[in-house]
Structure formats: C-alpha cells, structure tokens
C-alpha cells in the first residue's frame, strides 16, 4: 500500500544522529562564547537533515516523485553541510581537524575534496546503485550518510579559516567547479 503523500516518516537513524550532534554541539558551545548566529546556523543544518528525511518530503521522494528525492539530496549534501560548518567556531573546527589527524587534513585539501565530492555524486547516481537504494532502506540510509559526509568534506575548504585557507576568489572558483561538474 502506498502511503498518503502528506504522512510523516520516522527515520530513527537520522533523528538519533541529529540529537547526538546537537548535544555534542551544546556541550562545546557552553564552554565557548558562541555567537547566536553560529548556533542558529548549526541548528538549521541539523533541521535540514532531519526534516528532509523525516517529513512528507521522504514519503513523496520514496513513493511519488524522483525530483523530490533529488531535492532531499541537495538539502543534505549542499545546504546542510555549510550551515553545520559555519555553526562551528574556529576553535571547534580546529579541534575537529586535530582529532581527524593527517587523514582529515588530506581529505579536506581542495584538490582532494573536490574529486571526493564529484566521485561521490557520480557513484551514488549510477543507475544500478540508485535503483537499489530506492528499493532498500539500508542502502538509502547509506546513500544519505555518504551525501552528508561528502558534503562536509567538500565544504570544509570553503568554510575553513586555517592559516592555509583559500582566498575568496579561489573559494568561488572551487565552488563553481564543484557545482558545474557535479
């Protein structure tokens, strides 16, 4: 039976991940002086992910319109990651980078992050994988997690404020290349 297009879905994985991220952020924000706009950006990023995957959008995407599924992908890979990263203070981002070590430093280099973004988008949208993901909830969750991850990796060089941060024109070119090629 096909559900009502206005019915809400319940995807516990992304609700739980959103809750864990919110609690971790709240703890870190309590120790630092985080401006309200960073808190709002982080909350909006979590709301986009949880809302895209636990609302009528999910029902419509899964049972009615492929276009809505593509909108979900854009919400969780293109819109939520920059909001989540902007929500982090420079000190929080530096702590994450330190925790990630060399591997994190490597994958967030623009010359590595851009190919990861492109290969990720293309791989997820290969017809066989895409069709399988639309029929298998576990694969669909894996697809959504991958989109969030590649989104965070792609957006890190744009949002980063490290000593080796990209200049504004290079950030614009990087974003242009990423969106034109994907």
Regions found by a protein language model. Give the residues of each.
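Alpha-helical membrane segments of multi-pass proteins
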Residues: 1-182
């Amino acid at each position: 039976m096909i559900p009502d297009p206005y019915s809400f879905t319940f995807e516990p994985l992304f609700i739980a991940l959103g809750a864990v991220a919110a609690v971790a952020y709240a703890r870190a924000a309590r120790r630092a002086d985080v401006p309200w706009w960073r808190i709002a950006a982080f909350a909006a990023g979590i709301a986009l992910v949880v809302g895209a995957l636990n609302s009528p959008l999910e029902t419509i995407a899964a049972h009615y319109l492929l276009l809505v599924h593509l909108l979900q992908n854009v919400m969780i890979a293109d819109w939520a990651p920059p909001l989540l990263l902007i929500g982090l203070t420079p000190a929080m981002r530096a702590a994450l980078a330190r925790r990630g070590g060399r591997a994190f430093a490597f994958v967030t280099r623009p010359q590595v992050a851009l190919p990861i973004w492109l290969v990720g988008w293309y791989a997820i949208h290969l017809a066989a994988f895409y069709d399988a993901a639309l029929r298998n909830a576990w694969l669909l969750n894996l697809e959504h997690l991958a989109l969030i991850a590649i989104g965070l990796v792609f957006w890190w060089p744009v949002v980063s404020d490290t000593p080796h941060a990209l200049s504004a024109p290079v950030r614009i070119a990087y974003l242009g290349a990423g969106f034109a090629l994907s």
